[in-house]
A protein has these predicted regions:
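A short glycine-rich, hydrophobically flanked beta-strand micro-motif that places a catalytic Asp/Glu
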Residues: 26-27, 83
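A solvent-exposed, acidic/Ser-Thr-rich amphipathic alpha-helical stretch
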Residues: 34-103
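A generic "alpha-helical surface" signal
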Residues: 7-10, 54, 61, 118
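Short, low-complexity N-terminal intrinsically disordered segments enriched in polar/charged residues
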Residues: 1-24, 30-34
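A beta-strand edge to alpha-helix "cap/lid" segment located at domain peripheries
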Residues: 82-84, 89-156
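Short helix-to-loop capping/linker segments positioned immediately adjacent to catalytic or ligand/cofactor-binding
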Residues: 16-18, 71-78, 111-114
């Protein structure tokens, strides 16, 4: 039933953003299937059907590598995120998959306390629903603006 699925996806979204907002990034890849797609792109590129994105990963190992590089190799100004998400809209539901769209806003908090609106957009998600726990098969993060004012280090 759709309401139950919507509640499951909303709970999944809450756990996902909690993981990122609490800087528990080593757990972030666990929200995805081993073979998955994670892309961050702009609304213009998404509308034009352009596959390239600001971030592009085709499996969980690439997501794990991204976090490892973030923790040990990349140099960036320390900051954190605070997500606010809307309710998911169920686009489609099949026997073992479901797709949804969820709007989001992300505030960026810099190490000195400065807080600004960093990004708004929508998550286009495809979930594997065959197990007791939802896992993402695909997450396309579509940012409303084409202007990202800093290196996107932390995943959205």
């Amino acid at each position: 039933d759709t309401l139950s699925l919507r509640e499951k996806i909303a709970a999944f979204q809450a756990a996902y953003i909690r993981c990122i907002d609490r800087n528990e990034l080593e757990n972030w890849p666990d929200f995805f299937l081993p073979q998955c797609q994670y892309t961050v792109t702009t609304a213009d590129n998404h509308r034009a059907g352009l596959a390239a994105g600001l971030i592009w990963a085709s499996n969980r190992a690439m997501l794990q590598d991204r976090i490892s590089a973030l923790r040990h190799a990349n140099i960036y100004e320390r900051h954190s995120y605070r997500h606010i998400v809307g309710l998911p809209f169920i686009v489609d539901s099949q026997a073992q998959t479901a797709s949804s769209e969820t709007p989001f806003m992300v505030a960026r908090i810099m190490h000195d306390g400065e807080t600004s609106l960093y990004c708004t957009g929508i998550y286009h998600d495809v979930y594997n629903t065959s197990a007791n726990t939802l896992r993402l098969k695909s997450r396309i993060v579509v940012c409303d603006s084409s202007r990202i004012d800093t290196l996107m280090a932390i995943p959205l």
